[in-house]
Amino acid sequence: MRETPTFIVYPGPVYGWAVTAMGSTQSHFFSEKKVAVSYARSWAEANRPARVRVETREGRIEAEWVYEPFRK
């Protein structure tokens, strides 16, 4: 069974917000937090089961969503 993917939304290094899959070396950058969160939630929903975590600049968890597998 595969590990549940976690998509993390965090403040960008200079400005804006970034989204990455845990363990990935690539990020997607957005100027607005709302857009970054929406992107991460859509990404997680398409890859159920999955979770989305929004982190502060200090690394604290600000919000989290869990997407369960589709029911048969």
Residue ranges and their predicted role:
Residues 2-26:
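Short aromatic-glycine-(Arg/Gly/Cys) micro-motifs in beta-strand/loop hairpins
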Residues 27-28, 37-38, 70-72:
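A short local loop/turn or secondary-structure capping micro-motif enriched for an aromatic residue
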Residues 2-5, 59-72:
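A cross-kingdom feature marking charged/low-complexity
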Residues 30-49:
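A short, charged, amphipathic alpha-helix used as a generic interaction element across diverse proteins
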Residues 26-27, 62:
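Local beta-strand/beta-hairpin segments that build beta-sheet-rich folds
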Residues 49-56:
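A short amphipathic beta-strand at an alpha->beta junction
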Residues 22, 32, 66:
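Surface loops and adjacent helix of pleckstrin homology
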Residues 24, 58-59:
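Short coil turn/linker residues within repeat-based beta-strand modules
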